[in-house]
Amino acid sequence: MSKLMVFTGNANPELARRVVRRLGLPIGNATVGKFSDSEITVEINENVRGKDVFIIQSTCAPSNDNLMELIVMADALRRASATRVTAVIPYFGYARQDRRVRSARVPITAKVVADMISAVGINRVLTVDLHADQIQGFFDIPVDNVYATPLLLDDLQRQGHENITVVSPDVGGVVRARAFAKLLDDADLAIIDKRRPRANEAQIMHLIGDVEGKTCVLVDDMCDTGGTLCAAAKALKEHGAAKVLAYCTHPVLSGKAIENIKNSVLDELVVTDTIPLTQEALNCPQIRQLSMSDIMAEAVRRVCNEESISAMFGA
């Protein structure tokens, strides 16, 4: 741990401060800004020669600026002779562009970003709840994907809810929801089959499972515009659910997400701090945020000490 140093860009400095506080370290001294023409500029203001350096930087909105900050800072650290550079990317942007759909003339941007990260000399990536596990295969360097499930599960159990049914908001999330339900003493599982007529729009088609009188817990990796969760909450209430909660790792909350949530029948949306909340989101009474800092700090410590990450999750 004596060689460990942690730096951050402008994407999520508060999470970085929480992580270093738990590690008992100061945040690395770096200047990250822009030139007058909006190009990213980075200067490392202390000695990093021979150090094991971690950069905490989500690639959330503004995605391009935050990605370039990560890339440029990694280059600066390598040129300053850091022994190892690990990119800690709590929210990995561009992850939803992970395959070619509808047309052959589209990029696989998740692969492009993975190549950029590898090419700049980053040695390892540490991220949280990747949108698709197969993205790890896009990298030619080790990728550790840690999970927010222990944090979300602990919070749900502390709330003392009874008669819980875990709900997957779409067919693609069934594996995640089933795993969550299993950890809740094999809670009941329901599935919403939806069709998406166009990007960021969801239409409820069919509910599989009994939710009458239940506390329904929607589980997903992210909340973007909130359309899927709000439509799911409406369908669940129409089928007799007593209460509808949503637990999502990444609060993307783009577009009219806050307005959608405020106008929905969703009782509560619980998210983590992989992405900082806007003031509008902080003021929304239905949104509550938990911190991933304990899990992230332990993951950083384990990587630094060459210990198992999977052991954190009982594997």
UniProtKB/Swiss-Prot annotation:
InterPro entries: PRib_PP_synth_CS (IPR000842), Pribosyltran_N (IPR029099), PRibTrfase_dom (IPR000836), PRTase-like (IPR029057), Rib-P_diPkinase (IPR005946), Rib-P_diPkinase_bac (IPR037515). Mg(2+) 1 binds at residue 131. Its EC number is 2.7.6.1. Its main location: cytoplasm. It catalyses: D-ribose 5-phosphate + ATP = 5-phospho-alpha-D-ribose 1-diphosphate + AMP + H(+). ATP binds at residues 37-39, 96-97. Involved in the biosynthesis of the central metabolite phospho-alpha-D-ribosyl-1-pyrophosphate (PRPP) via the transfer of pyrophosphoryl group from ATP to 1-hydroxyl of ribose-5-phosphate (Rib-5-P). Belongs to the ribose-phosphate pyrophosphokinase family. Class I subfamily. This is Ribose-phosphate pyrophosphokinase. The lineage of its organism: Bacteria, Pseudomonadati, Pseudomonadota, Gammaproteobacteria, Oceanospirillales.
